[in-house]
Amino acid sequence: MGNLKEILEGGWSLVEGMRVTFRRLLRPVVTVQYPREVVTLSPAFRGHIELKSFADTGTHKCIACGTCERMCPSNVIKVQGTKAQPKGAKVATHYVIDFTRCSLCGICVESCPTGTLQYSTEYELAGESRWDGVIDLMQRFEARRPQSL
């Protein structure tokens, strides 16, 4: 009688397990087969930092004030700029950020007085070496910018 009870309990356990398996099998797939499928991003996604292009000027408005550099808790931002005209405002010439150490806290975006920093929607930043994460945002901005005729 003891063996029959064990067989029935084992059979019931098998039926219960198959019920759970089939129930999960009929649900829609949640896993995204990245990189074969494109990942749908949330509107609240905060990627890495990039320079924003303004429609009125067609360029960024970074004045190389260094506020973002001073406010960065990770100390990964280096900004350099020059004055285009003797009595004019400074214009950023280099905006280098080390994304391998950046915590993406967003303090630089919030503290920018001209609002020229924004979060990117790009999420594929893999590289072959550590130095691939050190990026000059000015070069990336110029590469993204449409060339005028």
UniProtKB/Swiss-Prot annotation:
The keyword Ion transport does not apply. Residues 51-82, 93-122 form the 4Fe-4S ferredoxin-type domain. [4Fe-4S] cluster 2 binds at C72, C102, C105, C108. Its EC number is 7.1.1.-. GO terms for molecular function: 4 iron, 4 sulfur cluster binding; iron ion binding; NADH:ubiquinone reductase (non-electrogenic) activity; quinone binding. Its cofactor is [4Fe-4S] cluster. It catalyses: a quinone + NADH + 5 H(+)(in) = a quinol + NAD(+) + 4 H(+)(out). It comes from the Bacteria. Keywords: 4Fe-4S, Cell inner membrane, Cell membrane, Iron, Iron-sulfur, Membrane, Metal-binding, NAD, Quinone, Repeat, Translocase, Ubiquinone. It is a peripheral membrane protein. GO terms for cellular component: plasma membrane. The keyword Chaperone does not apply. PROSITE patterns: 4FE4S_FER_1, 4FE4S_FER_2. It holds the Pfam family Fer4_7. Binds 2 [4Fe-4S] clusters per subunit. It is found in: Cell inner membrane. [4Fe-4S] cluster 1 binds at C62, C65, C68, C112. NCBIfam families: NuoI (TIGR01971). NDH-1 shuttles electrons from NADH, via FMN and iron-sulfur (Fe-S) centers, to quinones in the respiratory chain. The immediate electron acceptor for the enzyme in this species is believed to be ubiquinone. Couples the redox reaction to proton translocation (for every two electrons transferred, four hydrogen ions are translocated across the cytoplasmic membrane), and thus conserves the redox energy in a proton gradient. NDH-1 is composed of 14 different subunits. Subunits NuoA, H, J, K, L, M, N constitute the membrane sector of the complex. Belongs to the complex I 23 kDa subunit family. This is NADH-quinone oxidoreductase subunit I 1.
